């Protein structure tokens, strides 16, 4: 009976077009990030996952899904989160957060299965992401230049002059929040790196120049959000990018001195342009300086107070945490918080994971990130047993490393990463690695 049903489904029009349907849903998920509420994104991610599971059960595919080490690590993380759920004193509230985590992890596995069968969809997907990023960046720059009204108290203005107040752009993402926009744009910043290097490798210099300009626009838009956590993300993103460029130039050309002068001038002009933009904007300079203000800045002082309370929560629940979800966090945080410092989260991704699911969940998540980066480095730097690794595969690995470093760097100072707009884009990026069927020496 099962075989008859399976044969019927495999010969159907639906089965012949299932990958196209799944891809359309994925593009809808990416599109919904810029204009719809989080619930719609979650529903689309769940629909994508259900159809992928249906495909895996009933529709024949050419190759089996390869369960890599980082897939195992994130599964261990999820199992620990499940234990944390059943150990939570507020099960119903924690269950709400658990369902979100379940959808994210399920979506990651299903996206991995999708890209395993559809490697040709990687570049179009990254192109689509870059289009969304560019549109949001242009909107953000317009908002900054026209002076948008603040939706909430986003900046400490007690010790700065009116001309030093940043008009913090927030784009169209919902809920309106400049930190959310910054996290979203930062997560997609590496998409431009992939496209620039990919087109350069094909000697399509004019197209690469176009995406270089869009990269700078995206960079300026992130700066215009005034998000200091994103600025910290830059400290992880750009050193890694520069090291990769130096490594490539040294290997390909024998050193920077052998690069043509016009390419050096273009790079120098881009760097000078961004520095000029920052140095001629006193509001941005003041915003950068405030990072080092610590207790003298009310926003940073608020975060430090939340950190102190969250650390106490972790120390009281070190192994399984309090249970996942910001509703659960807020209820228990009230027992620890300093008066007047209410919060929905700990404002630090590693601390949030430790508080919600315990030290073992944090170790499993860090192991997951380590294994992803390790796989990317091995793929990018070594040859495989079956022959030559494609250049675009190496570039993809670099872009994913940059994405992880940038978002996790931002995550040291904020928990925007847990928002669907950032989280789903994060998982889509990493799931692309499943398309690389490479055996490393």
Q: What do the PLM-derived regions correspond to, one by one?
A:
Residues 358-372:
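Hydrophobic alpha-helical transmembrane segments
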Residues 1-96, 113-127, 195-209, 252-265, ...:
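Transmembrane signal-anchor hairpin modules in multi-pass inner-membrane enzymes, especially those
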Residues 294-308, 312, 316, 320-357:
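Long extracytoplasmic/lumenal interhelical loops at the membrane interface
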Residues 87-96, 173, 223-228, 412-417:
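Membrane-interface helix caps and helix-loop-helix hairpins in membrane proteins
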Residues 38-58, 98-107, 181-189, 232-239, ...:
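Membrane-embedded alpha-helical segments of multi-pass membrane proteins
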Residues 29-38, 226-229, 354-357, 388, ...:
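Membrane helix-loop boundary segments at the extracytoplasmic
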Residues 138, 144-147, 224, 242-296, ...:
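A membrane-periplasm/extracellular boundary helix in multi-pass inner-membrane enzymes
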Residues 26-30, 49-51, 82-83, 123-167, ...:
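Alpha-helical transmembrane segments of multi-pass inner-membrane proteins
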């Amino acid at each position: 009976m099962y075989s008859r049903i399976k044969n019927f489904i495999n010969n159907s029009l639906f089965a012949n077009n299932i990958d196209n349907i799944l891809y359309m849903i994925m593009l809808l998920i990416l599109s919904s990030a810029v204009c719809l509420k989080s619930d719609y994104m979650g529903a689309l991610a769940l629909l994508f996952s259900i159809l992928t599971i249906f495909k895996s059960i009933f529709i024949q595919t050419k190759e089996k899904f390869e369960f890599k080490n980082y897939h195992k690590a994130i599964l261990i993380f999820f199992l620990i989160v499940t234990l944390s759920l059943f150990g939570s004193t507020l099960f119903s509230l924690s269950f709400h957060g658990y369902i979100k985590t379940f959808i994210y992890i399920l979506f990651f596995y299903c996206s991995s299965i999708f890209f395993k069968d559809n490697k040709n969809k990687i570049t179009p997907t990254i192109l689509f992401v870059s289009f969304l990023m560019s549109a949001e960046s242009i909107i953000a720059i317009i908002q900054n230049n026209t002076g948008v009204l603040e939706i909430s108290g986003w900046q400490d203005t007690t010790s700065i002059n009116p001309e030093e107040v940043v008009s913090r752009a927030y784009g169209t993402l919902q809920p309106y929040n400049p930190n959310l926009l910054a996290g979203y744009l930062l997560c997609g910043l590496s998409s431009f790196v992939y496209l620039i290097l990919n087109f350069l490798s094909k000697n399509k210099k004019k197209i690469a120049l176009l995406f270089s300009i869009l990269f700078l626009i995206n960079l300026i838009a992130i700066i215009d959000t005034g998000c200091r956590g994103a600025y910290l993300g830059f400290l992880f993103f750009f050193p890694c990018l520069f090291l990769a460029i130096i490594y490539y130039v040294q290997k390909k050309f024998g050193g920077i001195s052998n690069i043509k002068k016009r390419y050096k001038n273009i790079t120098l002009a881009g760097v000078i342009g961004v520095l000029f933009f920052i140095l001629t904007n006193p509001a941005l300079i003041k915003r950068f300086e405030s990072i080092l203000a610590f207790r003298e800045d009310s926003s940073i002082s608020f975060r430090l107070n939340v950190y102190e309370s969250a650390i106490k929560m972790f120390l009281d629940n070190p192994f399984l945490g309090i249970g996942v979800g910001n509703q659960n966090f807020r209820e228990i945080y009230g027992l620890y918080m300093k008066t007047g410092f209410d919060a929905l989260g700990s404002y630090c991704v590693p601390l949030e994971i430790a508080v919600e699911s315990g030290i073992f969940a944090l170790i499993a998540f860090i192991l997951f990130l380590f294994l992803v980066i390790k796989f990317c480095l091995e793929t990018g730097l070594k040859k495989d047993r079956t022959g030559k690794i494609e250049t675009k595969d190496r570039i993809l690995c670099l872009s994913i490393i940059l994405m992880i470093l940038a978002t996790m760097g931002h995550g040291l100072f904020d928990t925007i990463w847990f928002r669907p707009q950032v989280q789903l884009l994060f998982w889509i990026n990493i799931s692309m690695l499943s398309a690389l069927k490479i055996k490393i020496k």
